[in-house]
Swiss-Prot record:
Keywords in alphabetical order: Aminoacyl-tRNA synthetase, ATP-binding, Cytoplasm, Ligase, Nucleotide-binding, Protein biosynthesis
Lineage: Bacteria, Bacillati, Actinomycetota, Actinomycetes, Kitasatosporales
Protein name: Glycine--tRNA ligase
Binding site for ATP: 194-196, 204-209, 281-282, 325-328
GO cellular component, one term: cytoplasm
Purpose of the protein: Catalyzes the attachment of glycine to tRNA(Gly).
Gene: glyQS
EC number: 6.1.1.14
NCBIfam families: glyS_dimeric, PRK04173.1
Length: 460
C-alpha cells in the first residue's frame, strides 16, 4: 500500500463529502473533523453492522447508552485520574511536543530494536535535529470541564475517555433488569474524549472520537478462553465486511506496556502506512480481570459481585473488552476499498477509473437512479422509481452530465448498483442495472427491480 494513499483518501473524502476539516472557515481546528453527507452514512452503516453483529444477533449481549459526563468519583475509582497519563517530551530546537513512547516505538519499528540511549538517539520528526528532546513528563489524557455556576475544585468534571466505565457503574442494574447471568455482555457506542499530545493522521487519532465497546462478564478462570473467542469474533467481523487479511495482524502488548487494568491486551492492527509507521491499532481486545468492578465496589460501597446459584458461591466477574474506534474502522475500510483500474469511455478508449469497492452493507448510497438524459418523459419516470426504492435503501438521483461520467461518480463513492432509465424503458418497462465492480449490465423489468436489488443487498 503506497504511503501517499492516505493523502488520496483525504482528498477524496473532502471532494466527495465524506469528511471535512472542522471549522475550516476559521482556519480549521487541529485534528478535528466533520463527517459530511456520505461520511455520516458510512459511519452509521459501520455502527449498524457492529451493533447487529455484537448485540441484536446474539442472546448474550444487551445494549446501554450512558452519560458522557459521569460523577468525578468514577474516574478516581477507575484509576484514570492517577494513571491516565502519557509521557510528554518537547524538542528544544523547534519546541514541538511529542509522546515519548510513540517516538521510541516508531524508531523500534523502523530499526528493529529500541534506541540504546532512549530519546537521545532520536531525530525530531519536525525539524530533524538529534538529541534535542527534554526529559519526559507525565501529561494527563483527561479532558476536564466545570459544572455549575462556579469554577473551583468542587465543580470539576471529566469528559469520558472511554465508554466502558458507564457500563461498569450500571453493571448490577443491567444484570438484574435484563435477567442475564454471566457469561453475558453489555455493549455501548458513543463519543469519548482524550487530550492527545500528538493527534493526527487524518481521522485515526483525534481528541474527540466515537467508540464501539462491549464488556463481556465471565466467571474467573474462564476469562482466557473467552478472550480467545472474542479475538476470533472481532477478526472475523472485519474480514467479513471486506478487510483483506494481508493488511491485518495481531499485536500482543508486552507486560511492561499493559494498561493499569489489563491482564492481557491484543490489538488488531491495520496496515495504514502512515509516514514513519506502517501499522496502527484498529481495535483492542483486553482482559480487564475484575479490576473495574472491584474498584467501583470498594469506592462506592455497593456490591458489584454475582451470586452463582448453581455453584452456590459469590464472585466478581472478570471482563473481556473488545474496543474499537469508529473513525479508525472507517479509515481502514476506505483504504482497503480504494482501487484504481481502467474502463472504456463512450468512444471505447480506456481511462482511469477510481472505485471504492466497499461491501454493499457499508456503502453510503446503495443504488443510484440515472435517467439516460434530462428528458420530460424519462426524468419523471426515473424520479418515481427513485422515490419507490427510497422506502428500502439510501438512493441517489442524478441526471447531470453524460451517463459515463455519472457512472464514474458513483464508482468513486462506492455505490454498488446504478439503475439507468432509458428510452427503451418507455416501451418495455425495464431498466438497465450496472454492477460497480464488474461493470456488467443487466436488463431488469420494473416490476422485478425491487426484488432483484433486495437479493443483492441482503443485510443493508
Amino acid at each position: 500500500m503506497a504511503a501517499d494513499k492516505i493523502d488520496t483518501i483525504v482528498s477524496l473524502s473532502k471532494r466527495r463529502g465524506f469528511v471535512f476539516p472542522c471549522s475550516e472557515i476559521y482556519g480549521g481546528q487541529r485534528a478535528a473533523w466533520d463527517y459530511g453527507p456520505l461520511g455520516v452514512e458510512l459511519k452509521e452503516n459501520l455502527k449498524r453492522q457492529w451493533w447487529r453483529y455484537m448485540v441484536t444477533s446474539r442472546e448474550d449481549v444487551v445494549g446501554l447508552d450512558s452519560s458522557v459526563i459521569l460523577a468525578p468519583e468514577v474516574w478516581v475509582a477507575s484509576g484514570h485520574v492517577a494513571t491516565f497519563t502519557d509521557p510528554l517530551t518537547e524538542c528544544t530546537s523547534c519546541h514541538k511536543r511529542f509522546r515519548a513512547d510513540h517516538l521510541e516505538e516508531a524508531y523500534e519499528e523502523k530499526k528493529g530494536h529500541a534506541p540504546e540511549n532512549g530519546l537521545a538517539d532520536l531525530n525530531c520528526p519536525n525539524c530533524g535535529n538529534k538529541g534535542t528532546f527534554t526529559e519526559p513528563k507525565q501529561f494527563s489524557g483527561l479532558l476536564s470541564t466545570h459544572l455549575g455556576p462556579t469554577q473551583d475544585s468542587g465543580s470539576v468534571a471529566y469528559l469520558r475517555p472511554e465508554t466502558a466505565q458507564g457500563i461498569f457503574t450500571n453493571f448490577a442494574q443491567v444484570q438484574t433488569t435484563s435477567r442475564r447471568k454471566p457469561p453475558f455482555g453489555i455493549a455501548q457506542m458513543g463519543k469519548s474524549f482524550r487530550n492527545e499530545i500528538t493527534p493526527g493522521n487524518f481521522i485515526f487519532r483525534t481528541r474527540e472520537f466515537e467508540q464501539m465497546e462491549m464488556e463481556f462478564f465471565v466467571k474467573p478462570g474462564e476469562d482466557e478462553k473467552w478472550q480467545e473467542y472474542w479475538m476470533e469474533q472481532r477478526w472475523n467481523w472485519y474480514t467479513g465486511l471486506g478487510l483483506r487479511e494481508e493488511n491485518m495482524r495481531w499485536y500482543e502488548h508486552p507486560a511492561e506496556k499493559l494498561s493499569h487494568y489489563s491482564k492481557r491486551t491484543a490489538d488488531i492492527e491495520y496496515r495504514f502506512s502512515f509516514g514513519g509507521s506502517e501499522w496502527g491499532e484498529l481495535e483492542g481486545v483486553a482482559n480487564r480481570t475484575d479490576y473495574d468492578l472491584s474498584s467501583h465496589a470498594k469506592a462506592s460501597g455497593q456490591d458489584l459481585s454475582y451470586y452463582d446459584q448453581e455453584a452456590q458461591e459469590r464472585w466478581t466477574p472478570y471482563v473481556i473488552e473488545p474496543a474499537a474506534g469508529v473513525g479508525r474502522a472507517m479509515l481502514a475500510f476506505l483504504l482497503d476499498a480504494y482501487i484504481e483500474d481502467e474502463a472504456p469511455n463512450a468512444k471505447g478508449k480506456l481511462e482511469k477509473r477510481t472505485v471504492l469497492r466497499l461491501d454493499p452493507r457499508l456503502s453510503p448510497v446503495k443504488v443510484a437512479v440515472l435517467p439516460l438524459s434530462r428528458n420530460p418523459e424519462l426524468s419523471p419516470k426515473a424520479k418515481g422509481l427513485a422515490q419507490a426504492l427510497r422506502q428500502n435503501w439510501n438512493i441517489e438521483f442524478d441526471d447531470a452530465g453524460a451517463i459515463g461520467r455519472r457512472y464514474r461518480r458513483q464508482d468513486e463513492i462506492g455505490t454498488p448498483f446504478c439503475v439507468t432509465v432509458d428510452f427503451d424503458t418507455l416501451d418495455d418497462n425495464a431498466v438497465t442495472v450496472r454492477e460497480r465492480d464488474t461493470m456488467k449490465q443487466e436488463r431488469v423489468s420494473l416490476d422485478q427491480i425491487e426484488g432483484y436489488l433486495a437479493s443483492r443487498l441482503v443485510g443493508c
